[in-house]
A protein has these predicted regions:
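Metallocofactor- and cofactor-centric catalytic cores in central/energy metabolism, strongly enriched
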Residues: 1-105, 110, 117-121
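Active-site-lining helix/loop region of Rossmann-like oxidoreductase modules
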Residues: 97, 102-104, 111, 115-195
């Protein structure tokens, strides 16, 4: 058995054991781990459930993130899956297909507890009042494990893609091209370890 499939099977067994040992009727799996390395959505791998399963059989680590294994295991065991990080796991058609097949919901796309939460609060105020925007600078200073993980460029890229898309989804440049088409948007996360 390939490593990814072995990982999925172990996760499925862990879910079954947890459910039995704790006498649970239902389980909801919530991903609240650190941000993973950015995995762009690839149609040939993520476009269908069959393609995703083939990539897992081939142990395609470039396209199969750990959270995808967790989501796959959860849905396969009849558990809803909630994504608490900006990973692409719940953005792929293959996962939607599995959710539909198992009749289990998938939800979430980052808990947005820091700069994105603030941005999500202020951007609608700017948009509603038709205030122009020339730039937006976002920063987080993190001294915890998240900061350490996000100090790695590949992990930061996942967070950056999520954070950059927030303004565009709220301000909708197509609706107000004179106000929101040509603004500068910079996202930074700084790791500052505690002494």
């Amino acid at each position: 058995m390939q490593e990814s499939l072995g990982y999925v099977e172990q996760l499925r067994e862990d879910i079954r054991n947890f459910k039995a040992e704790n006498n649970c009727d239902r389980i909801v799996v919530l991903w609240a781990a650190s941000t993973e390395i950015y995995v762009p959505v690839e149609e040939k791998v993520h476009g269908t459930l069959a393609a995703l399963e083939q990539a897992m059989k081939e142990d395609d680590k470039e396209h199969i993130a750990p959270s995808m294994c967790y989501a796959y295991a959860a849905l396969s065991e009849g558990c809803p899956f909630i994504m608490g990080a900006p990973n692409t796991t719940v953005d792929i058609p293959a996962m939607w297909e599995l959710a539909e097949k198992t009749k289990m919901p998938i939800a979430g796309k980052d808990f947005k507890t820091g700069q994105t939460l603030v941005k999500s609060g202020f951007a609608p105020i700017i948009g509603t009042r038709c205030l122009g925007l020339s730039g937006w600078f976002s920063t987080n200073i993190l001294g915890n494990r998240d900061g350490l993980v996000l100090d790695e460029p590949a992990n930061f890229r996942t967070k950056e893609v999520s954070k950059l898309s927030t303004l565009e989804s709220i301000l909708v440049p197509e609706d107000q091209p004179d106000l929101y088409t040509d603004y500068y948007h910079k996202v930074r996360i700084n790791y500052y370890p505690p002494p």
